[in-house]
């Protein structure tokens, strides 16, 4: 019996884990040699819900459809039939709730989604006075400072410093010196999740993929040519798993658009490192259960 078998790991398991780790390394680090061999573990669930009717002919959001999508995602994530019951598992009446959004001018968190989340939090028994919705200024917001629960919600896009604007990156406003995380393609962004104002508080992560931005060059890049009406939400309890799935979506869209492999630049190291260095969650696609709901045309992943 060799060392692999002594540890309960067959050669087949080892080869599978090694190959999937290589894929993950290539995806997030831009380097297929970034390999960490791990045995297969229980998968973390991410729900992708899409609805072709969530956007009208002008690209405007239909709030009632978006609210229904949110309910479908959360009930599926938690194996519940009733949205109210699902939210009561996430949020308790005594909670003080910060809804951390993103207000980047070209692609903000939709107001309709903020409203839908707040409606469900209130429905779980939280008074409106104990809820705050904001992006910047969270460290000066008394609700966020005293919060017992956070909901993390932002759109998916490419990003000049970190490769992707992600759920992990969305908490950078919990630092008074966010520029301090820019080194090495923002590889250690997950550190900010350990500050007292954020640590252990996140109940739900929602990555908005209604009209993601899949390409751009420069610090403030935005060209609507590089967005597309994907009409979806990615939802999970694990921010790393949701972000990892978002990266897969962007990579697939870039390949479809450019007709060749076009890696994200810079590579989204922060997502891989959030798993392997900071142990915030799971980045390996082989360890993620992706549940797909709704519209299937052009799903890409």
Question: Each PLM stretch: what is its role?
Answer:
Residues 1-301:
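N-terminal and secondary-structure boundary signal
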């Amino acid at each position: 019996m060799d060392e692999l078998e002594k540890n309960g790991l067959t050669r087949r398991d080892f080869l599978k884990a090694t190959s999937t780790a290589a894929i993950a390394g290539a995806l997030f680090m831009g380097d297929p040699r970034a390999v960490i061999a791990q045995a297969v573990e229980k998968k973390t669930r991410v729900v992708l819900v899409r609805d072709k009717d969530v956007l009208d002919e002008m690209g405007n959001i239909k709030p009632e459809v978006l609210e229904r999508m949110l309910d479908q995602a959360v009930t599926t994530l938690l194996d519940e039939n009733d949205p109210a019951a699902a939210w009561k598992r996430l949020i308790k009446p005594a909670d003080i709730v910060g809804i951390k959004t993103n207000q980047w001018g070209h692609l903000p968190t939709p107001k309709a989604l903020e409203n839908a989340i707040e409606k469900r939090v209130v429905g779980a028994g939280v008074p409106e006075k104990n809820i705050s919705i904001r992006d910047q200024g969270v460290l000066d917001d008394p609700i966020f400072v005293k919060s017992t629960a956070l909901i993390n919600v932002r759109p998916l896009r490419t990003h000049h410093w970190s490769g992707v604007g992600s759920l992990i990156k969305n908490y950078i406003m919990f630092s008074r010196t966010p520029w301090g995380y820019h080194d090495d393609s923002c590889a250690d962004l997950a550190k900010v999740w350990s500050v007292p104002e954020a640590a252990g508080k996140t109940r739900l992560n929602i990555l908005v993929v209604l009209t993601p931005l899949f390409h751009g060059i420069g610090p403030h890049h935005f060209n609507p040519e590089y967005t597309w009406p994907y009409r979806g939400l990615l939802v999970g309890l694990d921010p790393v798993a949701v972000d990892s799935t978002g990266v897969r979506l962007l990579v697939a869209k870039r390949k479809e658009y450019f007709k060749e492999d076009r890696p994200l630049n810079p590579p989204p190291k922060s997502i891989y490192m959030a798993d392997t260095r900071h142990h915030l969650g799971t980045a390996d696609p082989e360890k993620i259960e992706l549940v797909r709901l709704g519209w299937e045309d052009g799903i890409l992943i």
